[in-house]
């Protein structure tokens, strides 16, 4: 829905829509510099790839005034690095679903993951951490499929888990489908990811569940690192860092070093 929103906004405002030749940070950087792009909409994963690849240093991206991100949870570490790499750009979080369309929200600050819903036509509530929406634009149903999260009274269960603060501001935690069940204990991948991102040398993280004979699942991780230490060393480093910060069942039991994090065609982390 984010791509459609960007395209329609360009049509409505008479703006020029620039499409990079390939889905790569290098191609995006070249397109931004060549066409002096003002607005950069992208997923957090792709924005992190741009940071890791040094795209901002290779190309003049000073014309970027707004970076709009969404489609998946944004790691705090990536958001903070973006703010430093693009000091003159406004970082705007976006939210929407194919079933409801985009929802008008406002980020609390450039380096804050919290936002508030400012759409007067949208009702919202949080049920067991899951965000529910009711909008005039909600779809009626699916062709040749069950109604899934579409409720008869007009509500839509988004499948997005959120944290809500005392001021009714929301923060996306992750997808309900990505929660790892370790012997009956629920583990949010984003919580583990945030702790691992505190470790110097870890550039990107993917947390997922791996089958285990006794607990059913165990927490596993793939990491992109800047050093040349092996998986065994990093596993020890991760366990030492997580001890006291995470419950024992949330600490990754499997650590795999990879060159890049697996993403889907929409440049979002692959949910396993």
Enumerate the predicted regions with their spans:
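AMP-binding/adenylate-forming
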Residues: 1-49, 66, 92
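Alpha-helix/helix-capping structural signal
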Residues: 45, 72-73, 137
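Conserved ATP/PPi-binding loop(s) of AMP-dependent carboxylate-activating enzymes
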Residues: 125-153, 185-187
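AMP-binding/adenylate-forming catalytic core of the ANL superfamily
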Residues: 40, 96, 135, 161-250
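Beta-strand->loop->alpha-helix junctions that form or flank phosphate-binding loops
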Residues: 92-99, 116-119, 208-210, 256
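Gly/Ser/Thr-rich phosphate-binding loop
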Residues: 39-41, 53-112
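AMP-binding/adenylate-forming catalytic domain of the ANL superfamily
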Residues: 244-268
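Short hydrophobic/charged patches on amphipathic alpha-helices used for structural packing
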Residues: 26-29, 56-58, 193-194
């Amino acid at each position: 829905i984010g791509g459609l929103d960007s395209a329609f906004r360009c049509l409505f405002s008479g703006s020029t829509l620039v499409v990079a030749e390939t889905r790569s940070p290098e191609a995006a950087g070249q397109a931004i510099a060549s066409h002096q792009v003002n607005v950069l909409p992208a997923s957090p994963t792709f924005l992190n790839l741009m940071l890791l690849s040094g795209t901002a240093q290779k190309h003049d991206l000073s014309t970027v005034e707004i970076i709009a991100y969404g489609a998946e949870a944004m790691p705090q570490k990536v958001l903070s690095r973006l703010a430093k790499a693009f000091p003159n750009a406004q970082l705007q979080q976006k939210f929407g679903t194919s079933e409801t369309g985009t929802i008008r929200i406002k980020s609390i600050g450039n380096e804050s993951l919290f936002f508030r819903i400012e759409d007067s036509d949208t009702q919202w509530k949080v049920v067991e951490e899951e965000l529910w929406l009711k909008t005039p634009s909600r779809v009626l149903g699916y062709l040749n499929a069950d109604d899934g999260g579409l409720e008869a009274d007009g509500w839509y269960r988004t499948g997005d888990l959120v944290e809500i603060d005392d001021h009714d501001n929301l923060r996306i935690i992750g997808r309900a489908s990505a929660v790892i069940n370790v012997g009956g204990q629920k583990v949010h991948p984003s919580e583990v990811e945030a702790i691992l991102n505190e470790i110097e040398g870890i550039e990107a993280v993917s947390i997922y569940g791996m089958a285990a004979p006794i607990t059913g699942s165990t927490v596993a991780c793939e990491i992109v690192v800047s050093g040349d230490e092996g998986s065994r060393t990093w596993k020890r480093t991760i366990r030492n860092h997580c001890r006291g910060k995470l419950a024992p069942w949330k600490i990754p039991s499997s650590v795999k070093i990879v060159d890049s994090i697996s993403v889907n065609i929409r440049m979002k982390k692959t949910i396993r």
